[in-house]
Regions:
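A short, Lys/Arg-enriched amphipathic alpha-helix from helix-turn-helix/homeodomain DNA-binding modules
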Residues: 144-162, 171-175, 179-183, 188-231
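Aromatic/histidine-rich interaction motifs
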Residues: 123-153
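A short, N-terminal "cap"/entry segment at the start of jelly-roll beta-barrel domains
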Residues: 1-38, 43, 51-52, 134-141
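Long, charge-rich low-complexity segments
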Residues: 3-9, 110-115, 218-232
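N-terminal regulatory/effector-sensing and dimerization cores
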Residues: 34-131
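Inter-domain helical "communication" segments and dimerization helices
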Residues: 126-129, 166, 188-190
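A ubiquitous short alpha-helical element
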Residues: 53, 82, 137-145, 195, ...
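Alpha-helix N-cap/helix-initiation sites
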Residues: 55, 167-172
Length: 232
């Protein structure tokens, strides 16, 4: 009997997890668009056709696709991601986003979970090896390859939409598990940025919020820097 390699087993597990998560999202989303769920901060989305590029300010979040593909542009950098990847934004960012792969037979499906700085900070306090280093903060958006641990936690969280009575008890525990795996992964540094008050990422996020609130008003760089505790 042929031995199934570890990589093959992992690929089969990811395919099974992805198929179940896609079924949950499609069952919940009867129409195209963004659909909030009963779980605070968790959103499902579905689109049956590619979209034009559109500007949006995206909150700090974790997002993954189970079907379809998307292009995200941040400044002069272009990011392509699909069902093989997850996306992390560690600050509120102005992005140009476009769904590049979707059809009625295979709609664009995915989920997004807003990142809670308090929740991440509490988890970090229990895990000393997750304490931030003095390394410089990188760009606040990144895409990495999905893992069975991350996809499995996201799937368990999504399953809870069918049992609303379990959400208050189980959702925080599953979210903590998901955050643990994200902190342990390639983009752990970006999650740590979310929890660091006064970090460069935190200041950038505050600056974007400050500008959004005063979009139609004249502003001075000195005033902006003072409002978010940044140097010019």
């Amino acid at each position: 009997m042929n031995q199934i390699s570890s990589d093959s087993r992992q690929a089969l597990e990811i395919a099974s997890q992805r198929a179940e998560l896609a079924a949950i999202i499609e069952q919940y989303c009867s129409t195209d668009g963004t659909h909030p769920t009963p779980i605070p901060g968790l959103t499902f989305f579905r689109h049956a056709a590619p979209s034009a590029a559109a500007c949006a300010v995206v909150k700090s979040l974790f997002a993954l696709l189970v079907q379809g593909a998307k292009r995200v542009v941040l400044a002069d950098e272009v990011y392509e991601y699909d069902q093989r990847h997850y996306l992390i934004t560690s600050v509120d960012l102005p992005l140009l986003a476009q769904i590049t792969e979707a059809s009625p037979d295979a709609p664009y499906l995915g989920l997004a979970l807003e990142l809670d700085a308090r929740q991440i900070g509490e988890l970090m306090s229990k895990m000393p090896h997750f304490l931030p280093s003095t390394a410089t903060v990188s760009r606040g958006l990144a895409i990495s390859e999905i893992t069975t641990d991350i996809l499995g936690a996201a799937l368990r969280l999504a399953r809870l939409v069918a049992t609303p009575e379990a959400i208050p008890v189980l959702a925080p525990l599953i979210e903590q598990e998901l955050l643990y795996h994200l902190l342990s992964g390639e983009q752990g540094g970006r999650l740590r940025d979310v929890a660091i008050k006064g970090s460069q990422s935190h200041q950038i996020s505050r600056a974007i919020q400050w500008i959004n609130q005063r979009f139609t008003e004249p502003m001075a760089i000195d005033e902006l820097a003072g409002a978010v505790s940044m140097s010019k």
